[in-house]
Amino acid sequence: MSKFIQHTGIVVPIDVSNVDTDVIIPKQFLQKITKKGFGKHLFNDWRYVDEKGTILNRKFILNNDIYKNGTILLARENFGCGSSREHAVWALVDYGFKTIIATSFSDIFYSNSLKNSLLPITLSKETIDILFQEVYKNMGMFISVNLLNNKIFVREKQYSFKINSFNKYCLMHGLDDIDLTLKYSSKILNYETLIPEFLKK
């Protein structure tokens, strides 16, 4: 898993509440268990006007040249609701997103994001409203996210966000569940030598 310490990128505003995982990555594309290749299907039903995904919907924001290289997604409340498919996070990461800023996330989506180096940031509705106003006034605006200091830098302003210290540590060191287990493998093996034989059966 890649490390997340600091990132500066273009903000892509998705001004919609309750964006569910079927919108993020429709079910017909969930045929792989590898994490690559889902980016081209991100927001498929919004990005394309045909079922084959060959004709772009020019009204959708990711098809705007200003935003096509965006890496920070700005959203409303309950982002990532719906089914628990981790493919939704894979699609966002594969497209190039590094962080999502929203009023709230579904619990499972939030957890899946942390396990894939996608930083989910929650801010108050009032702050999210301000950020949307800034983005609309300054299309293609860059902002910076600093995980070390828990700060978002937007032009001359800065906003603080909260994150669990354990999740922060894992993101900054690029550790997923497997990495964490391997980190303590020697202790696990030592503990297993202490288990009585009758408990091993």
UniProtKB/Swiss-Prot annotation:
Its EC number is 4.2.1.33. Coiled coil: none annotated. GO terms for biological process: L-leucine biosynthetic process. CDD domains: IPMI_Swivel. InterPro entries: 3-IsopropMal_deHydase_ssu, Aconitase/3IPM_dehydase_swvl, AconitaseA/IPMdHydase_ssu_swvl, IPMI_Swivel, LeuD. Keywords: Amino-acid biosynthesis, Branched-chain amino acid biosynthesis, Leucine biosynthesis, Lyase. Pathway: Amino-acid biosynthesis; L-leucine biosynthesis; L-leucine from 3-methyl-2-oxobutanoate: step 2/4. It is an enzyme of class 4 (lyase). It catalyses: (2R,3S)-3-isopropylmalate = (2S)-2-isopropylmalate. PANTHER family: 3-ISOPROPYLMALATE DEHYDRATASE SMALL SUBUNIT, 3-ISOPROPYLMALATE DEHYDRATASE SMALL SUBUNIT 2-RELATED-RELATED. Catalyzes the isomerization between 2-isopropylmalate and 3-isopropylmalate, via the formation of 2-isopropylmaleate. Heterodimer of LeuC and LeuD. This is 3-isopropylmalate dehydratase small subunit. The lineage of its organism: Bacteria, Pseudomonadati, Pseudomonadota, Gammaproteobacteria, Enterobacterales. The gene is leuD.
